[in-house]
Amino acid sequence: MLGAGLSNFPWLSASILFPIGSAFVIPFFPDKGDGKEVRWFALSIALITFLITVGSYINGFDINNENVQLKENISWLPDLGLTWSVGADGMSMPLILLTSFITALAVLAAWPVKFKPKLFFFLILVMDGGQIAVFAVQDMLLFFLTWELELIPVYLLLAIWGGKNRQYAATKFIIYTAGSSIFILLAALAMGFYGTEIPNFEFSHLAAQDFNQKFQIFCYVGLLIAFGVKLPIVPLHTWLPDAHGEATAPVHMLLAGILLKMGGYALLRFNAQLLPVAHAQFAPLLIVLGVVNIIYAALTSFAQRNLKRKIAYSSISHMGFVLIGIGSFSSLGTSGAMLQMVSHGLIGASLFFLVGATYDRTKTLKLDEMSGVGQKMRIMFALWTACSLASLALPGMSGFVSELMVFTGFVTDEVYTLPFRVVMASLAAIGVILTPIYLLSMLREIFFGKENPKLIEERKLIDAEPREVYIIACLLLPIIGIGLYPRLVTESYIASINNLVDRDLTAVKSAVKTNIFSGTKTNDILKAPTI
């Protein structure tokens, strides 16, 4: 009886509304003191939210079911066709868990925040619920609203608690992300009103629609721009290094760990799932853009002398594998893209947290001024080394498995011609080779070499404290666990990914056989698969 009650519990609505509702309790806390009560309250709410998302996975989610589960559907504004529709399938559940997990650690990372702690933790909790909502909603208009909701906390967290150029970085972030979001609204309205006067924005309804080719291309291009900004895709990426360059450590963790994954998830959910004919035509472009991301960002990261910007460009490079996986038309490659999002969420959060912790001690981000601090911070060096090895895809860690899955899935799948696969894989390998070069050289510059006397004398360089070790340990544990046994994560989404890929392969086969790509470059790259 208890099990039946738990299975009927509105897990997803609770995981969205609980942190947002709890955030509105924070203004009633007293302003006196250092904000200790607010910190403990925010941490408690974030941990409970994480437990709620874990409960949704344990009590109501079937990993063998490819369909949307844990569905909650309440008519909200029927005249506008808007419903409170939430649910989770294999593509959203891992990211919901990742969001609540990273947010809880980000709250712990924000423990030293002394300036306006009430507002800071209020925004973090609102952001927690908003980001979970992005992955859980099953209505496209509601998706747009939640997509916009999480922009406000990020903007304020950058503009108020950022570095010297925080206003510029925050303004650039909001212009890029909010400006590109208009394409989501236009696509939602076009798809919701398609062929009817009564709008319906639910994903299940849109997936059943037979959108014509030109309509799909129109929506696909707009959504690719909007989601490409968030992923980000070169050349829509320039907001990210500026945002990371000014953000504090907990905001870093949320940006790298969760925000970028929203773009990859949305490409899978909308472009690949709802617009399969257009996806068949644009998938080769995604492959090319993914390779450009990997090489360009790796080269740029190699040249950076600012620690935050170096890691920011490294993130852009790693997200290129997500693009390749999404465009691969391979179950293995697309599964690798999903795993790469989870893996990079953990690795990116760990690296950016360490960047913040290192800056708190050295008060500089310039690599030229950091040499020789390893003698004073040996535990910090060990943490940096472990997380850097994870980022360069060391075997036994999650990054290795996800990148290998993407490469293998793309290269071995026969949807693309052999020359295209060989050329793209060879170019992407350049970025893979560059990654250990710039990461290991970064470690050498920070921790080894001749000590900077000015830095050593002026700063009391203390080693990592227990709170910092605990945060990194919490991130490294799943990184290593996934690296050793990937099925911990892949089993949760493989049924949904197989269903998605089958749908896209059918579109490719139909498109090629009907000469839909006749006279285009795509026609020379794609060939009809055997299904």
Swiss-Prot record:
The keyword Transmembrane applies. Its main location: membrane. The chain crosses the membrane at residues 9-29, 41-61, 93-113, 117-137, 141-161, 173-193, 217-237, 248-268, 282-302, 311-331, 337-357, 381-401, 422-442, 469-489. GO terms for cellular component: plasma membrane-derived thylakoid membrane. It is a multi-pass membrane protein. NDH-1 shuttles electrons from NAD(P)H, via FMN and iron-sulfur (Fe-S) centers, to quinones in the respiratory chain. The immediate electron acceptor for the enzyme in this species is believed to be plastoquinone. Couples the redox reaction to proton translocation (for every two electrons transferred, four hydrogen ions are translocated across the cytoplasmic membrane), and thus conserves the redox energy in a proton gradient. This is NAD(P)H-quinone oxidoreductase chain 4. It comes from Prochlorococcus marinus (strain MIT 9301). The gene is ndhD.
